[in-house]
A protein has these predicted regions:
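Non-catalytic signal-transmission and effector/linker regions of two-component phosphorelay proteins
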Residues: 1-2
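CheY-like receiver
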Residues: 44, 50-98
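Acidic di-acidic motifs
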Residues: 7-9, 86
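Generic anion/oxyanion-binding catalytic loop in active/binding sites
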Residues: 5, 31, 43, 57
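Two-component/phosphorelay signaling modules centered on CheY-like receiver
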Residues: 10-34
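Conserved sequence signature across two-component system core domains
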Residues: 6-7, 36, 54
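Secondary-structure boundary motif
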Residues: 22-26, 48, 74
Length: 98
């Protein structure tokens, strides 16, 4: 299973990546996890080889996570998108992306 985590805050990126790895390990599921500090580098890779699951920060410079989700959906309906945010008001906007 190919997983990507995209967050512009390195501390959150590393912490979430560790937790994701631990959860999948607990259920004995092998994963490959890539980390990205910006949406542009993530999209370059995702466009070449789409991920199965993407953990995506909503608030990022250059391109926000909601715009990235639109680009993911244009490429693949199968990719599971899980939004990450500390802003409660953005949670409801993320419901429009399936």
């Amino acid at each position: 299973m190919q997983i990507a985590v995209c967050d512009d805050e390195k501390v959150y990126l590393d912490c979430l990546s560790r937790k994701i790895k631990a959860c999948f390990k607990e259920f004995e599921i092998e994963i490959s996890l890539d980390k990205y500090l910006n949406a542009v580098s993530f999209l370059e890779q995702h466009n070449q080889n789409p991920y199965d699951i993407v953990f995506l920060d909503i608030l990022m410079p250059e391109m926000n996570g909601l715009d990235v989700a639109n680009r993911i959906r244009n490429l693949s309906e199968k990719t599971i998108i899980i939004f990450i945010t500390t802003e409660n008001h953005l949670v409801y906007e993320s419901f429009d992306y399936r």
